[in-house]
Structure formats: structure tokens, C-alpha cells
Amino acid sequence: MAYIFALIFAFVVCINTDVIQAEEIQHDTLRNMEYRLSCTPKNSECERMTDICCPGFQCLGCNPYDKNDVNKCKCQ
């Protein structure tokens, strides 16, 4: 009898673990989607200290230490 209860308990724990993992994967996917919607695409103007370029690109083309630079950077 104890063997049957142990199997049922193991089965329930396994199912709950799979559900938790599926929720984490779905949450991670939503977080990535929000990040990609908020990132600055290629060749768009960006500010080096505040904007986030989309993955694979960097905010380049300006010098924040040069007072003559108008800070027109682009995600490249």
C-alpha cells in the first residue's frame, strides 16, 4: 500500500514540476519579446548612455567627451 502512495506522490510531484517549468519558459519568452519591442533597431539614432540597441548592435558614431559632437549616434 505504501508503495502505491509513493508512486502516486512521485507522479504528482513530476507533473507539478513540469507545469512550473512550462510557466518559467513562457515568462522568459514574454520578457524577451518585451525587450525586443523596446530595443532600438539597426541604423536608428540612439543615445549612448540611455538607449538599448537590439541584440547584435552597439550605439556607435558619437563621442560623449567631445563638446562639438552633437551626439547623433546610430545602432550599428
Curated annotation (Swiss-Prot):
Annotated Gene Ontology cellular components are: extracellular region
Write out the entry's keywords from A to Z: Disulfide bond, Secreted, Signal, Toxin
Q: What's noted about post-translational modification?
A: Contains 4 disulfide bonds.
Coiled-coil annotated spans: none
Q: Which GO terms of the molecular function aspect are on file?
A: toxin activity
Where is this protein found?
A: Secreted
**Expressing tissues:** Expressed by the venom gland.
From which residue to which does the signal peptide run?
Answer: 1-22
Q: Which family does it belong to?
A: Belongs to the scoloptoxin-13 family.
Name of the protein: U-scoloptoxin(13)-Cw1a
- Output the lineage of the source organism: Eukaryota, Metazoa, Ecdysozoa, Arthropoda, Myriapoda
